[in-house]
């Protein structure tokens, strides 16, 4: 069975509450989020979301993960499966950790299942890293300039 871990992080000079508010305000994603273009659903454990990503060259990917953890201002996690469990499972986590007067925002994704090596052979890993970095940068900019927009 294959296993891959993708992890990116950034420091955001803002309180956890502000970071959480922006990263869970799905309706505003089209305004600022270059990677997750659309997200729908309720952030409650057991609820299913609909997530639409924009990858390289305008490619789009839609998936429907199930929310597994919601700890406001600390952690959001969901699990997506392709077909049956064990084929290609994706456990994505968004963590907000105290760091000085701001936070460290960590986004990680653990991919498991027998299809994982095939998915990563088609350049998925590089596209996800670029997307995660774009998400992190855009979130940091959005949150740190919130006072300027208000």
Region roles according to the model:
Residues 81-86, 108-115:
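Short, solvent-exposed aromatic-acidic interface loops
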Residues 60-62, 87-91, 115-121:
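A short, polar/proline- and glycine-enriched secondary-structure boundary/capping micro-motif
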Residues 104, 111-150:
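A conserved amphipathic terminal alpha-helix motif
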Residues 4, 29, 65, 91-94, ...:
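Non-catalytic interaction surface on structured domains
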Residues 40-85, 99, 104, 137-150:
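Glycine-rich portal/gate segments that line the openings of hydrophobic small-molecule binding cavities
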Residues 8-10, 63-69, 90-98:
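Hydrophobic/aromatic beta-strand elements that line small-molecule binding cavities or substrate pockets
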Residues 1-44, 134:
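Hydrophobic ligand-binding cavity/cleft-lining segments
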Residues 33, 80, 119:
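Short, flexible helix/strand-to-coil boundary loops that buttress conserved ligand/catalytic motifs
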């Amino acid at each position: 069975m294959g296993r891959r871990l993708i992890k990116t992080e950034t420091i955001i000079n803002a309180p956890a509450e502000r970071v959480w508010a922006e990263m869970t305000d799905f309706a505003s994603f089209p305004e600022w989020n270059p990677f997750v273009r659309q997200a729908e659903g309720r952030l409650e454990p057991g609820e299913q979301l609909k997530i639409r990503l924009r990858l390289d060259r305008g490619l789009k990917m839609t998936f429907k993960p199930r929310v597994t953890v919601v700890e406001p201002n600390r952690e959001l996690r969901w699990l997506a499966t392709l077909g049956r469990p064990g084929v290609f499972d994706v456990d994505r986590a968004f963590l907000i950790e105290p760091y000085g007067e701001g936070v460290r925002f960590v986004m990680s994704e653990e991919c498991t299942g027998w299809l994982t090596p095939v998915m990563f052979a088609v350049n998925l890993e590089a596209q996800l890293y670029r997307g995660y970095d774009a998400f992190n940068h855009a979130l940091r900019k959005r949150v740190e300039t919130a006072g300027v927009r208000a």
